[in-house]
Amino acid sequence: MNKTIEYQKEFLKENNQLLNIPIKKNILKEILQNDEQDTIITNCITKEVSINLDLIKNPKVLYSIYIMVVEYLKSINIT
């Protein structure tokens, strides 16, 4: 595993609560390939989506999720 992927996984694990933010499921489904959709656990009541990072094998998927979390952080002025 290259250092970029390791960094992204660590960043996302450290900000794990941000993976439970309400996001548009259709955006996430576009990011995730069909065979990786089982990495999503959806809570229909709260409309929160959580992601099991250990199940994601595709670096592009990981990067897309990483960017989504970074954008969310920017939107709430944490970064």
Swiss-Prot record:
Recorded family membership: Belongs to the asfivirus D79L family.
Superkingdom of the organism of origin: Viruses
Protein name stated in the entry: Uncharacterized protein D79L
